[in-house]
Amino acid sequence: MLNTNDPAFSAYTQTRQAHWDAVAQKRDSWRGWGGTYHRRLREVYRYLVRPNQRVLEICAGFGDLLAALEPARGVGVDFSPEMIRRGRERHPAIEFVQADAHDLSAIEGPFDAIILSDAVNDLWDVQTVLEQARRLCHPQTRLILNLYSHLWQGILSLAQRLNLAAPMLEQNWLTLDDLSNLLNLSGFEVIRAWQEVLLPLPIPLLSTLFNRFLVRFWPFYHFALSNFVVARPQPEAVRDEPSVSVVIPARNEAGNIHAIFESVPQMGCRTELIFVEGHSQDETYATIEREIAAHPAIPSLLLRQTGIGKADAMRLGFAHAGGDILMILDADLTVPPQDLPRFYRALCSRKGEFINGVRLVYPMEREAMRPLNFLGNKFFSLAFSWLLGQPIKDTLCGTKVLWRKDYNSIVSNRAYFGDFDPFGDFDLIFGAAKLNLKIIDLPVRYRERTYGTTNISRWKHGWLLLKMVLLAARRIKFI
């Protein structure tokens, strides 16, 4: 625990407070190369933090970054009286609080996002500050940090001497490994880390090329100016038993319906089955009706799809779901319903916030997946893992599980990507990545069909997958 009466800590704080007061007094008239850098930071943070959230920025300075995020409630904390005074003049809608980052007891939370931008390298005790931030979190809070790379220490020192960058006192120069360790000690779990800004200078075309594209590739990202980290509070298992809605898109699957009723296990306090029948050429709809009548003890709902495609069917099913947890189960039963409790436990233990089934770990039954489909899935798993910044081994496994409240957030953010996905898988995966949800792969044994034929057109869907890669590149990776 930090001893705030430590004379060394007091001297450190007083020196830095005076330093940042002096920086604040001349920042309005000061001109340097920081404009390009801070504009890029605002772009990145606006991607990471949705408008109308509750946002806390620790070491907020003037609050320019915080105001750019358009929060429903924005709180900016800084220990510099001059920074606070000028911040209030610039951004009257922001709540500014003069306080030391090592003691946030005066702040009332919780917050949806907490930001430490270019701050941790200037702190006396990073762990104490992170522990203070942890107190202001709810389970879905995202802590977002960025910090200068040690590699730029010499360049930044030269820029300060040339009056091209704001002067800094002695820094901690934490590495990403240092920061990850401190986050773990303070009650946080890292979701992803990456690099930003290769060229912090306003050079037309080159700035965009370096800062949006080259910085994403090896070896260029090793030379980036800023390291970014997104973390969440370390998870605690759910204590109650959330209810479950299992959404089952079904097209030409009459022969599998009875097995679904017999094999989907009870999960949580209530498990409901929601069938969405989609223009079948066999007796799927009538079969579901009969099975619902034959199983009155199982809460069930049958919907007839008016649109086209699996994505439309999933959205229709989710719109009628009443469970706390939403599950997708393909009616072909290539993923056994008996595996669903594993997904339930993974979500309720909060090991992940989006549980993604993976068919590519265990050996498959002989006819479960054609060789070209298998190779294609391998390629796309590598591509999407790189694009999303989290490991995702299989994008098209039909079984995916998430909290309904997170699905509602994906829906509210859907306009960012548009109506692009005929599968439904990418709408969920991209939406989860955009929300910085913790994505966890859960291996399943993929079975061959026992009834009917696949509804997947290999070449048509392969082309659509390529388009998904391009969309993820444009809207997620190269923002």
Describe the role of every protein-language-model region.
Residues 3, 211-244, 255, 259-266, ...:
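Hydrophobic helical membrane-anchoring modules
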Residues 152-167, 172, 305-320, 337-418, ...:
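Acceptor/aglycone-binding surface of glycosyltransferases and processive sugar-polymer synthases
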Residues 97, 285-320:
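Conserved donor nucleotide-binding strand/loop of the catalytic core
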Residues 2-51, 204, 213-214:
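Conserved class I S-adenosyl-L-methionine
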Residues 127-139:
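A short glycine-rich, Lys/Arg-flanked "PGG" loop and its adjoining helix->strand segment in the class I
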Residues 277-286:
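A conserved acidic beta->alpha catalytic loop
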